[in-house]
C-alpha cells in the first residue's frame, strides 16, 4: 500500500517534468494519506500550485499524477480550497497539508 513517504518520493522524482510541462510551483498532500489514516480504497488528495493558470491542461496533469501514483487522485488548487464554503473542512485541509 502507498504511504505518504512513498507518495512524496514519487512526486519529488517527477518534479522536473511537472515544472517543465505544467509549471508546477508546489505540491502538497492532504487528507487520509497525510494523516496516516489511508486504506486500500483511499484516493490521494493533493493541492497543486502553478506558476500560471493551465486551463484544460489541468485534466492532463491530473491524469499524469494518477498514472505515476497508480491511484485515483483528487487535486485542488489553493483557490479551490478558498472556495470551500464549509470553514471547518477548508481549515482541516489547510492544516493537514504536507508539502513535498
Q: Where do the PLM segments sit?
A:
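Catalytic core of pol beta-like nucleotidyltransferases
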Residues: 1-26, 35-36, 40, 51-100
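Short beta-strand->loop micro-motif that forms the acidic, two-metal-ion catalytic signature
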Residues: 45-48
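Conserved histidines in hydrophobic membrane contexts and catalytic metal-binding motifs
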Residues: 29
Amino acid at each position: 500500500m502507498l504511504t505518504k513517504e512513498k507518495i512524496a518520493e514519487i512526486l519529488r522524482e517527477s518534479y522536473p517534468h511537472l515544472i517543465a510541462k505544467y509549471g508546477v510551483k508546489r505540491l502538497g498532500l492532504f487528507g487520509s494519506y497525510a494523516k496516516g489514516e489511508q486504506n486500500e480504497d483511499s484516493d490521494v488528495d493533493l493541492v497543486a500550485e502553478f506558476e500560471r493558470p493551465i486551463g484544460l491542461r489541468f485534466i492532463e496533469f491530473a491524469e499524469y499524477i494518477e498514472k505515476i501514483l497508480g491511484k485515483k487522485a483528487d487535486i485542488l488548487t489553493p483557490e479551490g480550497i478558498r472556495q470551500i464554503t464549509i470553514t471547518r473542512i477548508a481549515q482541516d485541509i489547510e492544516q493537514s497539508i504536507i508539502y513535498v
